[in-house]
């Protein structure tokens, strides 16, 4: 299912800037190796401008801790999840849940075209960042959930849950919040 344009992650832009971001991270590593603080600061500014995100030195240290350069570059390239102009429809929510749950699900075939890596690697590298950096924050920002409800653990914590079960958990939490609001009004 195609989501509304305002919901979809701008994967085309991410793919376009990905090589530049990857190159800048490599240049940052080289500048760190020769302890060129001025060059490091300049590269951080370039990354922030290119991605439209506030990137810090700490953000760049992540790939040294195990995420890897490709994963970090893709995280930087992903657009920020928007605050939607109208609430998510149940079908849209279910589509997003499917995308989070099923790594073989391919909502963005254009991502895999012309990439210099095997398709399976790309899916693996990009599926988790897409969930963590885009889909989870999108849901957290746009669903009317109780403050005590953590979508990542309360809805998606059971790895064996089917997408329809996760949808039911989220809808139940949203209904509970609505019911509680009505009782206090």
Where are the regions a protein language model picked out?
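Compact alpha-helical subdomains of small soluble proteins
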Residues: 48-60, 65-73, 116-185
């Amino acid at each position: 299912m195609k989501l509304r344009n305002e919901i979809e992650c701008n994967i085309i832009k991410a793919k376009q800037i990905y090589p530049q971001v990857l190159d800048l991270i490599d240049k940052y590593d080289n500048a760190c190796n020769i302890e060129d603080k001025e060059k490091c600061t300049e590269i951080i500014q370039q990354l922030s401008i290119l991605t439209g995100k506030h990137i810090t030195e700490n953000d760049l240290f992540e790939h040294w801790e195990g995420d890897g350069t490709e994963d970090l570059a893709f995280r930087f390239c992903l657009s920020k999840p928007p605050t939607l102009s109208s609430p998510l429809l149940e079908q849209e929510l279910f589509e997003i849940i499917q995308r989070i749950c099923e790594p073989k699900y391919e909502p963005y075939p254009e991502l895999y075209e012309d990439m210099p890596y095997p398709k399976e690697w790309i899916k693996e590298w990009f599926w988790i960042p897409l969930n963590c950096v885009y889909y989870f924050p999108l849901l957290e920002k746009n669903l009317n959930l109780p403050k005590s409800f953590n979508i990542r653990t309360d809805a998606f914590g059971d790895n064996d849950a089917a997408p329809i079960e996760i949808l039911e958990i989220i809808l139940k939490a949203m209904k509970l919040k609505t019911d509680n609001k009505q009782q206090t009004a």
